[in-house]
Swiss-Prot record:
Record protein name field: Kassinin-like peptide K-I
Cellular localisation: Secreted
Cellular component terms per the entry's GO annotation: extracellular region
GO biological process: defense response; neuropeptide signaling pathway; tachykinin receptor signaling pathway
Keyword annotations: Amidation, Amphibian defense peptide, Neuropeptide, Pyrrolidone carboxylic acid, Secreted
UniProt tissue specificity: Expressed by the skin glands.
């Protein structure tokens, strides 16, 4: 389950 915080890193 990917955390939303990790997604921010991609952005």
């Amino acid at each position: 389950q990917p955390h939303p915080d990790e997604f921010v890193g991609l952005m």
